[in-house]
Amino acid sequence: MFEINTSAVGDSLGLTALVAILPLIAFFIMLLGVKARAHTSGAVALAVSLIIAIVGFSMPVDMALSSAVRGGLFGLLPIVWVIITAIWFYEITVASGRFEDLRKTFDLLGDGDIRIQAILIAFCFGGLLEALAGFGAPVAITATMIMALGVKPLRAATVVLIANTAPVAFGAVGIPVTTAGEVAGRSADQTHDIAALISLQVLLIAAIVPFLIAFILDGFRGVKETAPAAAVIGISFALAQWLAATFFAYQLTNVIACIVSLGCAFAFLRVWKPKGVKELRERLELPAAESTTDLNGRRIWMALLPYAVVTVVFAVATAAPAIFGFLKLHFAWPLLDDAIVDADGNLMDTSFSFNVFGNPGTLLLLSGIIVAVVYHFFNENGRYNLSFGQPVSAFGDVVSRMKFSALTIILVLALAYTMNYSGQTIAIGEFVSSAGGIFALFAPVLGWIGTAVTGSDTSANALFGNLQVAAAERISVNPDLMLAANTAGGVVGKMISPQSLAIAATAVNMEGKESVILKNVVGYSVAFLAFVCVIVFLMTNVLGFLVP
């Protein structure tokens, strides 16, 4: 039996917390100081954590190693599995040629106004990509699409980075939320509560992002001339995101929010047209808008089909879990089962569970197969030819491209579980909670820092999720609120992460000028962070009625 001792080093909580935070410091030094690759940084941090667990916290060697393997397996199943299938799902649309029709659909909706087109592409479609792929895909893809509209590189990069905020928390089919709940040992219902709280914390950010996109592209004139459409898109997205995260399946939050906002935009733009479109194109020296006369209802529907399919598949899995939930793996973890007692004297749950057919990754695989079959047989007389071999080849390509990213995720989760099970995270949590209720004001900063450094809200939750819970319990605040705060902080930190900046710079042909892009977006990031901090703090008292 291993008992967690938060004063294991020198019989001092402060000294123990200082030693416990060394793995995180090592991770950030390797990543930012040494400029090592993320998986190398994760490996070094894991090694430091294992040494501290064994030497500093007196955890048996076999239990420490088993903790790391337990975390690594969760990193693989379901996180890496979900990411691989999500990216593969998107690649099917590209291989089929239908993706080009989707791009033209946005041109048709925007009626030649690049400000509205940019909102639809970067915010709505980018949100769909974030829902299915995440991990930089929305930034890379939407940046090139906006550049194709004639927008200058720096503005295009700024637009897509700021647009990639509100959807981040529910990216890759809700993996950041799932990770937050898993590493902190929350139940399925509690994890759903976390999702609902996140949607409230980022509600206003989601609503104002379309206005910011218009401002970046055309200043206050752009905001004035597109305000009605920006309001419809932003408010419909924010409300749909909240409703989906609160009352439906949080894994589909982004898909639903994006489809709803696109639908509202389509309906609204049929009765309202933006002003100053011709003058805008002349003022910004833009080329003539691309013709969309060859588009028809059938082609538009087929371009949108993948997102309808994934919505239906996930809806069925949620409404009738028995259909996909007949094969669930659940077993006690070797060496750890009933063997770890936390700081409060309670046994920690270390069991492993995996729903083979009902997890988001397998559901995405099924959705992709359905889409591939439909695209194969309904190919417009060969115009959109998709052979059965192409999806198979694309899957292999995705696995190959993902190998280092997958290794990073596995190592970061191994680090998180080692820190959690050995007591390192709890020691840090107890120490920071000594700040009292004011800690709630700064809780989102941890998620902001974690995401800014790692480039992933999922990784930030893996690193700091249990710490947030430990701190919340010490100051008698709802742990789910602090987990949500960590995720919401990560949402606004994504735009300044080196990973996101590098992807944006590459997409707009500004390689080596990441610092220029950073200067353009860092102010927005800090302002958003301050707003989230205030909202979270108010939810611990004045707005406490919003917390489940």
Language-model segments: which ranges?
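Interfacial loop-to-helix junctions that mark the boundaries of transmembrane helices
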Residues: 6-17, 35-41, 65-77, 192-200, ...
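Structural signature of hydrophobic alpha-helical transmembrane segments
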Residues: 8-22, 75-79, 132-138, 192-207, ...
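Hydrophobic mid-bilayer segments of alpha-helices in multi-pass membrane transport proteins
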Residues: 19-29, 36-58, 80-86, 230, ...
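Membrane-embedded alpha-helical segments and adjacent helix-loop junctions characteristic
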Residues: 66-149, 157-158, 382-470
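Juxtamembrane helix-boundary/capping and inter-helix hinge elements in multi-pass membrane proteins
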Residues: 94-99, 111, 146-156, 182-191, ...
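Alpha-helical transmembrane segments of multi-pass membrane proteins
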Residues: 114-127, 153-166, 190-210, 408-411, ...
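Juxtamembrane and boundary regions of transmembrane helices in multi-pass small-molecule transporters
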Residues: 169-284, 488-548
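Transmembrane helical segments that form the transport core of multi-pass membrane transport proteins
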Residues: 293-450
